[in-house]
Amino acid sequence: MKSHYRLPGILAAAAATLVTSGIADASASAPDSKPGPSGATAYGWVRNANSAHCLAVPGGSTENGIGLIQWGCGSWRDHYWQFEYAFNSGGRNYYRLRNLNSQQCLAVPGASTTPGTQVIQWPCGTWKDHYWGIEYTNRGTRLVNWNSGQCLAIPGASRVQGEKAIQWPCGTWADHYWNI
């Protein structure tokens, strides 16, 4: 007959469940750090829709400033990236892409706006070239650099392993689309 004493305990347990599940989280309005159903701590491939190769760090290097490439997708740690939500601008969500192996971010060297500049990994910061917007189109998903306004691409729509990843003015070329 002590059920009225259990109610506060039940309510406290329910509230704790809501908070730990993220349902009552104050930041619930911000999207997951990785777009899609994978969740906030998920790392996944950034796979080029044209070549089916993944954005990778050559040799799994942890060196600052190393140029990024495409490579056949595998279980290597340097093939996995986390999307960390940063902000929304002009209706587009922007993220930092953090590499699982090096813990460095996808960046454009020196905040260059020159088409064809190879993208690099660099210690994550708040520089404009570290943020990438997700642009959903009827042809697929593009990653657009906040600083340059250019897309992550593979030159000449190459399907060769080891081809560099670059920024290029956004277009409808097949190598501008990524599966994330």
Set out the residue ranges of the language-model regions.
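Secretory targeting and sorting signals
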Residues: M1-A30
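Extracellular glycan-recognition/adhesion modules and their associated mucin-like linkers
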Residues: P31-T62, Y80-T113, Y131-R159, Y177-I180
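Short, tandemly repeated low-complexity microdomains enriched for cysteine and small residues
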Residues: T62-F83, S112-H130, R159-T172, H176
